[in-house]
Amino acid sequence: MAKDIKFSADARSAMVRGVDILADTVKVTLGPKGRNVVLEKSFGSPLITNDGVTIAKEIELEDHFENMGAKLVSEVASKTNDIAGDGTTTATVLTQAIVREGIKNVTAGANPIGIRRGIEAAVATAVSALKETAIPVSNKEAIAQVAAVSSRSEKVGEYISEAMEKVGNDGVITIEESKGMETELDVVEGMQFDRGYLSQYMVTDSEKMVADLDNPYILITDKKISNIQEILPLLESILKTNRPLLIIADDVDGEALPTLVLNKIRGTFNVVAVKAPGFGDRRKAMLEDIAILTGGTVITEDLGLELKDATIEALGQASKVTVDKDSTVIVEGAGNPEAIANRVAVIKSQIESATSEFDKEKLQERLAKLSGGVAVIKVGAATETELKEMKLRIEDALNATRAAVEEGIVSGGGTAFVSVLDAVSGIELTGDEATGRNIVLRALEEPVRQIALNAGFEGSIVIDRLKNSEAGAGFNAATGEWVNMIEAGIIDPVKVTRSALQNAASVASLILTTEAVVANQPEPASPAPAMDPSMMGGMM
């Protein structure tokens, strides 16, 4: 395929046009008074959203060179979303500001490499200053504040803070669609896995079709149990204690399953059997998790253990187990807290080194199950369009809250960027590097300027007053008042703020140092096929 190539100023100006088109579309959503953008979908109703990364991903431009510029900014939004889960619109605004100021200077004859070094030095200083001013987030009220600011809903803030309190900061919090119109929170405490009872005759509550086991022993094995004789000595030992038994095995079939069911029906023995969760190596890891949580041992040939030799000491224990046809929940396992903490630490290190998103997600699920439970926020809305928009907002809020817990918070509304201006301007640089620093100084004002503009105020006036205000003061764009941002609950996570700046500077620097752009030439349209003369008989 033939290529179309542009060089130097032509290349950069074409890409900048794409940057501006995407950024101008996204930045109208910034702040509490940000507007919505309507996205056409190939089927179904249009999506109305103010989520920066969702909008950025939808933009595709006809001109190949402009499209490359737009896609680079979209990459900034996506990367910021991946790292911090929020701040995508801020990152887009910062990218446009750095590119716009940078291009002016490069066109005027400045060296792009020198400008890039200045930008990098300024951003490193700004990030250090942001981290120094960070306020730790630890209590429920602060978590609710962060979530409420991100989602623009105090109710959502309450749900997220309550969920994090119940399942821990590392716990799994999922967002699902509710069957009703109300948004609600559902918390499953303890370890849950998606395996139900192997026979409905094992239930203890025939109305709800669930099996409740109080203070049970738990047999954990990766073997298939087909012969009841293999576990008969163990069953006799448990029978003497008059406690129920949960069997977690690869499978229970042959004569073993009907024998267990028969004893359950007769009231001789309260037992429930379920299949082990997961597959392959993941199954082994999950069985080990269950064993550590309950203080038991996995009966496996890998450890040289046989079912026939298993004793009551090898069994796990829990205060309660609930099993329905689809899932099993183990509450308050009797495992050693130190062993559980060590296992959690191992899984955390595996998450950090995982390269696959799928592996990372599965490891986080295991971590949550060991840490204390799963919370589900069920989103309700009057229409499908509203439901989609609400889900996106809650996802952003959840990510922002986790980021805040991780690295702390700073004052919101873009004021944190303005607060580091003195630190950045204090860097001693010369020549083009000083120009790079000045570009960042101008860009750091842009989020506040855009938030004010979206709320119907003059951005330059807000910036001037902010620079002359005392530390902590800022402009509340929602009300048009000047307030102490932290006290007013207008806050941003440090991780979101610094990720937006770092990613914006990285991609903007690449655009400024671009000297050639290579694009595919559009293929000419195929000519229409000639009409067959034999089909023109009636026209002569």
Curated annotation (Swiss-Prot):
Entry GO CC: cytoplasm
Keyword field: ATP-binding, Chaperone, Cytoplasm, Isomerase, Nucleotide-binding
InterPro entries, sorted: Chaperonin_Cpn60_CS, Cpn60/GroEL, Cpn60/GroEL/TCP-1, GroEL-like_apical_dom_sf, GROEL-like_equatorial_sf, TCP-1-like_intermed_sf
Pfam family, one: Cpn60_TCP1
Subcellular location: Cytoplasm
Binding site for ATP: 29-32, 86-90, 413, 476-478, 492
BP-aspect Gene Ontology terms: protein refolding
Subunit text: Forms a cylinder of 14 subunits composed of two heptameric rings stacked back-to-back. Interacts with the co-chaperonin GroES.
Protein name: Chaperonin GroEL
Designated gene of the protein: groEL
